[in-house]
Amino acid sequence: MAEVPGTSSETITETVQTGTPPPPQQEGRSLTIKLRKRKTEKKVEWSSDTVDNEHLGRRSSKCCCIYEKPRQFGESSSESEGDDEEGCGSAHCILGHGRRGHGQREGGGTTVPPSSGGTNPH
């Protein structure tokens, strides 16, 4: 049998199922999105009693009396508390730290840092 040019036929078969509903789309599931506040950038804030150890109008935590001596492994901080009797021992300390405390002299008076506007008795 010979084909005639320019003619063609096509058959499409479509099967439709009726009576069965499509499977449910898990209607019980829900999604909860919680918004969280952005983390604030960490800032250092100095309290009014923070030492200005350079007397330049800046606050600093570099005061020599804050330093803690390294301890042997396993040594508790309470074992070395008696060592604080010597004071800070720093040659750069201008606040007069010693076993009597910040700026205290033997006579009971206090030392005045040079830039604080106090008078020098010498």
From Swiss-Prot:
One of its GO terms (biological process) is negative regulation of cytokine production. Residues 1-33, 72-122 are annotated as: Disordered. This is E3 ubiquitin-protein ligase PPP1R11. One of its GO terms (molecular function) is ubiquitin protein ligase activity. The gene is ppp1r11. Residues 111-122 have a biased composition (Low complexity). Residues 78-87 have a biased composition (Acidic residues). Pathway: Protein modification; protein ubiquitination. Residues 88-97 are annotated as: Atypical RING finger domain 2. Keywords: Phosphoprotein, Protein phosphatase inhibitor, Transferase, Ubl conjugation pathway. InterPro entries: PPI_Ypi1. Atypical E3 ubiquitin-protein ligase which ubiquitinates TLR2 at 'Lys-754' leading to its degradation by the proteasome. Inhibitor of protein phosphatase 1. It is an enzyme of class 2 (transferase). It catalyses: S-ubiquitinyl-[E2 ubiquitin-conjugating enzyme]-L-cysteine + [acceptor protein]-L-lysine = [E2 ubiquitin-conjugating enzyme]-L-cysteine + N(6)-ubiquitinyl-[acceptor protein]-L-lysine. One of its GO terms (cellular component) is nucleus. Transmembrane segments: none annotated. It comes from the Eukaryota. It holds the Pfam family PPI_Ypi1. Residues 1-12 have a biased composition (Polar residues). Its EC number is 2.3.2.27. Residues 55-65 are annotated as: Atypical RING finger domain 1. The modification Phosphothreonine is found at residue 20.
